[in-house]
Design a protein with these regions (language model features):
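Active-site loop-to-helix "anion-binding N-cap" substructures in soluble metabolic enzymes
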Residues: 1-259
Length: 259
């Protein structure tokens, strides 16, 4: 790793309010990986996304606040590159020998990211010597920076990604009953296969977050303007049907405030 450029894909999709980070959990979790790379004298090029700008530049979704937060936590100088990623090349990244970390702008400012565009992935790969994925929560997506890129650069799992996989292995292969799973998020459609796989293994599954709104709506409750995903009734019906067959109780909120 000595003096190698490491393209580090992280999930720094943290909540922002008026340009301020309101929860740094995702940032805190990736510090061990960054410190490990620094200890081994690597140069780090951080890739991430935040929000859903849908291929357009949205100033409120810039990674600049995340850069400032990392500076404070690591006590290191970090270079933020706001330049169009498609115009950045490897010699633009580090101005001098002492620079160790750079952060590129929000990947989702570019429609090629979510389209899993091959040329965009090739370009990202050209910026470094090695690719490290430490974004477990993004790894189910076939995007240019998580999937296609691995075809063009030596690729490895990061420390946090390995911890997440180990945790999953424990709950799927070393189960001690009775056991309950809590699952949340906003999109139930992206988690349907996970839920179906978990139902036979768990006694109870508690659905929280935005997903719970879809369940409440399915059950006939008025959810007002609360966040929900469209066209999910069939998915939820499948979940409840399978849960009955496998003797798994699906639990969802009963006492809620509707937006």
């Amino acid at each position: 790793l000595n003096q190698k450029k490491i393209l580090l894909r992280l999930d720094l999709n943290v909540p922002l309010s008026n340009g301020k980070i309101t929860d740094t959990t995702r940032i805190d979790k990736i510090l061990p990986t960054i410190n490990f790379l620094l200890k081994n004298n690597a140069k780090i090029v951080i890739l991430s996304h935040i929000g859903r700008p849908r291929g357009k530049v949205v100033n409120e979704l810039s990674l600049k606040p995340i850069c400032e937060s990392l500076k404070n936590k690591l006590k290191k100088n970090i270079k933020f590159i706001s330049k169009n990623i498609k115009e950045v090349n490897s010699i633009d990244l580090f101005d001098n020998y002492d620079e160790k970390i750079v952060i590129l702008e929000n990947l989702r400012f570019y429609e090629e990211e979510e389209k899993n565009d091959t040329e965009f992935a090739k370009h990202l790969a050209s910026l470094a010597d090695v690719y490290v994925n430490d974004a477990f929560s993004c790894s189910h997506r076939a995007h240019a920076s998580t999937f296609e890129i691995t075809k063009f650069i030596p690729s490895y799992a990061g420390l946090q990604l390995n911890l997440e996989i180990d945790a999953l292995n424990k709950i799927t292969s070393e189960i001690k009953k009775p056991i309950t799973c809590i699952i949340g998020g906003s999109k139930i459609s992206s988690k349907i296969n996970i839920i179906k796989n978990l139902i036979p293994k768990f006694d109870n599954i508690i659905i929280v977050g935005g997903m719970a709104n879809n369940v409440l709506k399915f059950k006939g409750h008025n959810i007002g303007k609360s966040i929900q995903e469209d066209n999910c009734d069939k998915i939820i019906e499948e979940i409840f049907s399978l849960s009955v067959k496998k003797n798994c109780k699906i639990i969802y909120p009963e006492d809620v405030t509707v937006g």
